[in-house]
Amino acid sequence: MNVKVFRVSGYFEKNGRKFKFTKEYRALKEEHVKELVYSDIGSKHKVKRRKIFIKEIKEIRPEEAEDIVVRRLSLEL
C-alpha cells in the first residue's frame, strides 16, 4: 500500500462566522482524509461535523507539501 499526501481546503462555521482552512495529511484514501479533517477540526475548534464543509481534496506530490512534518515523513521513505 502506498501512502499519499492530500491537501484539503474548506471552511467551518462557528458562532455564525465562517473560518477557512487548508490542511495537509498523509493517508491511503480520500475517505480516510475526510475522517481526519472532521476529527481534527472538530476536536480543536469544538465544531460538529455538519458545520465542517470540505470544498476540495487534492492529491499532491510530497515535494509540494507546505507542512514540514508531512513533507519530511513522506520524503524519508
From Swiss-Prot:
Biological process (GO) annotations held by this record are: translation
Tell me, what is one Gene Ontology molecular-function annotation carried by this entry? large ribosomal subunit rRNA binding
Q: Name one Pfam family in it.
A: Ribosomal_L18A
Q: Is Cytoplasm found in the keyword set?
A: no
Q: Which domain of life is it from?
A: Archaea
InterPro entries (UniProt xref): Ribosomal_eL20, Ribosomal_eL20_dom
Q: Which UniProt keywords apply?
A: Ribonucleoprotein, Ribosomal protein, RNA-binding, rRNA-binding
Similarity-based family:
Belongs to the eukaryotic ribosomal protein eL20 family.
Instruction: Please give the name of this protein.
Output: Large ribosomal subunit protein eL20
Q: Which Gene Ontology cellular component terms are annotated?
A: ribonucleoprotein complex; ribosome
Q: How does it assemble?
A: Part of the 50S ribosomal subunit. Binds 23S rRNA.
